[in-house]
C-alpha cells in the first residue's frame, strides 16, 4: 500500500514538473512574431503615442446638454481631431443605393426623433440630423478630411458581411489613402483577400469570432504567420491566464474595447503589452 502511494505521488510530482517545465519554456522562449515592416511599426507608434483610439468619433454634447456617443458624424470627427486625437475608429456601411457612409446602422440615426429605415438611401441619410443636430458623414466626406489632415489614421469597423466588398470599394476609389485606413478583420479568412487588395495595415478584432476562432492559442498561431498591427479583444477574455499567455507568446500587441472610465483607461495603458484602448473619451 505504501509502495502504491509512493508511485502515485511520484507520478503526480512528475506531471507537475513537466507542466511547470512547459510553462517555463513558453515564458522564456522568444515570441515567434511575424516580421514587422517599417510601415506597421510607424502605425503602431502613432497609436502608442497617446494609446487612445477614439470610438465612432467619440462623445459629443447635444444642445440639451446630453452626452452622446456612437454618432460617426462629421461633427464628432472634427471635434475629436481638434482635441488632439489622431487615431479614430469609424463604422462604415453601404446604403441601399451603394454609397459608403459612416454609420453602424442607419436605423440608429435620428431624424426629428424617428428612426430611418435600416438601410436608407444616401440622400435620405444625408438629409437627416443625428440626435436632431449632428451632420451625418459619407466616406467621401471622411476621405476629404483625411486629405486635409495627413496625420489622421482611420480604423474601420465595417458592418456585418460587407467587410470585403466595402474594402474593395475603398481600395478602388481612394487608393492614395489605403495606408491610412487600418482595416479590422473579424475572421481569419478575411485576411488574405483584404491584404491582396493592397491594405498593408490590418487589426484582427475578435468580437465577431466564433467559438473555434476565439481559441487564443489558435489566434496566437495565426498572428505568428501574418503581419498584424494588433489584436483587439475584450479585457474580460484577455485576462484569463491561458489567453494572456497565448497573446504574449505571439508578440503582437493587444488593444481593448471599449473603455469609458478614465482611470481604467489610463491604468490599462500602463501595461507593456497594451498598444491602445478604444474609448469614447476624446480628451
Where are these regions (language model features)?
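Phosphate-group recognition and catalysis centered on beta-loop-alpha active-site segments
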Residues: 2-283
Amino acid at each position: 500500500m505504501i509502495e502504491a502511494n509512493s508511485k502515485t505521488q511520484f507520478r503526480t510530482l512528475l506531471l507537475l514538473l513537466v507542466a511547470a517545465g512547459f510553462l517555463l519554456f513558453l515564458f522564456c522562449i522568444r515570441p515567434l512574431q511575424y516580421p514587422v515592416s517599417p510601415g506597421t511599426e510607424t502605425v503602431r507608434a502613432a497609436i502608442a503615442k497617446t494609446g487612445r483610439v477614439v470610438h465612432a468619433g467619440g462623445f459629443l454634447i447635444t444642445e440639451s446638454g446630453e452626452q452622446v456617443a456612437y454618432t460617426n458624424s462629421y461633427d464628432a470627427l472634427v471635434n475629436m481631431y481638434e482635441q488632439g486625437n489622431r487615431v479614430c475608429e469609424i463604422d462604415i456601411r453601404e446604403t441601399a443605393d451603394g454609397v459608403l457612409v459612416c454609420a453602424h446602422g442607419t436605423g440608429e440615426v435620428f431624424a426629428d426623433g424617428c428612426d430611418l429605415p435600416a438601410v436608407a438611401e444616401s440622400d435620405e441619410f444625408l438629409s437627416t440630423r443625428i440626435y436632431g443636430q449632428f451632420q451625418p458623414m459619407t466616406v467621401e466626406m471622411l476621405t476629404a478630411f483625411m486629405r486635409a489632415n495627413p496625420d489622421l489614421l482611420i480604423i474601420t469597423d465595417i458592418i456585418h458581411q460587407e467587410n470585403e466588398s466595402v474594402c474593395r470599394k475603398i481600395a478602388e476609389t481612394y487608393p492614395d489613402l489605403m495606408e491610412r485606413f487600418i482595416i479590422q478583420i473579424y475572421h481569419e479568412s478575411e485576411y488574405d483577400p483584404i491584404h491582396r487588395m493592397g491594405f498593408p495595415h490590418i487589426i484582427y478584432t475578435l468580437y465577431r469570432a466564433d467559438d473555434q476562432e476565439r481559441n487564443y492559442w489558435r489566434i496566437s498561431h495565426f498572428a505568428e504567420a501574418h503581419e498584424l498591427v494588433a489584436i483587439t479583444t475584450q479585457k474580460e477574455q484577455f485576462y484569463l491566464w491561458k489567453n494572456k499567455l497565448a497573446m504574449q507568446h505571439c508578440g503582437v500587441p493587444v488593444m481593448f474595447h471599449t473603455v469609458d472610465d478614465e482611470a481604467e483607461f489610463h491604468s490599462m495603458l500602463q501595461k507593456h503589452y497594451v498598444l491602445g484602448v478604444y474609448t469614447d473619451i476624446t480628451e
